């Protein structure tokens, strides 16, 4: 997994909230999770391509949830080579760190959208339009759950 632009996962406190982002050009999925319980939940999807409204919405989420850190999914091909979106996701992670001063950690997001789509279909969301509305938030949840399962502190 690539190096994170902020502190290492060990630098996170044992307790606190994390927000995770599944970055895309048209949508950003957002999930929330807790370090203590090590559970992630889909939160919402930010729509639109303009940077200013996206960061304004993220600022509101940070104010509401008061996270101790942020996680950004980093795409790569199955063989681990960088994806076309890797540089854009890394730039987004750096912007989050620069704007908000929180630790921003990267997490491998390979196949998270495919896993989210499969989970939604299995849960009974068969209409593709309905799945599309929540797909990115569920992908962010999968990214954050993977991060919580593979990094940081031992389960209480």
UniProtKB/Swiss-Prot annotation:
Principal localisation: cytoplasm
Subcellular location: Cytoplasm
E.C. numbers: 3.1.-.-
InterPro entries per UniProt: RNaseH-like_sf, YqgF, YqgF/RNaseH-like_dom, YqgF/RNaseH-like_dom_sf
Keyword Nuclease: yes
Keyword Hydrolase listed: yes
Keywords (A to Z) from UniProt: Cytoplasm, Hydrolase, Nuclease, Ribosome biogenesis
Highest taxon listed in the record's lineage: Bacteria
GO molecular function: nuclease activity
GO cellular component, one term: cytosol
GO biological process, one term: rRNA 5'-end processing
Task of the protein: Could be a nuclease involved in processing of the 5'-end of pre-16S rRNA.
Membership in a protein family: Belongs to the YqgF nuclease family.
Name recorded for this polypeptide: Putative pre-16S rRNA nuclease
Organism: Aromatoleum aromaticum (strain DSM 19018 / LMG 30748 / EbN1)
